[in-house]
Amino acid sequence: MDQRMNGVDPKMLELLVCPLTNGRLTLNRENNELVSEKARLAYPIRDGIPIMLVSEARKIED
């Protein structure tokens, strides 16, 4: 699946960082989320727009 399938511009994904840690994010295509491994948070992508609010992020459990 191409990154454009989720409606997010790949160039924008390169610029985004975790608002909590300022760390790198990786795209989880299966769940349509941007994942911060350092913060253990997954930020949702809704209608092609990354929701970069900690309050909206899902905690990643082990």
From Swiss-Prot:
Q: Name one GO cellular component term.
A: cytosol
Per the UniProt record, one Pfam family is: Trm112p
In terms of InterPro entries, this protein maps to:
Trm112-like
Family, according to the entry, reads as follows: Belongs to the UPF0434 family.
- Name recorded for this polypeptide: UPF0434 protein Avi_4243
| Protein's organism | Allorhizobium ampelinum (strain ATCC BAA-846 / DSM 112012 / S4) (Agrobacterium vitis (strain S4))
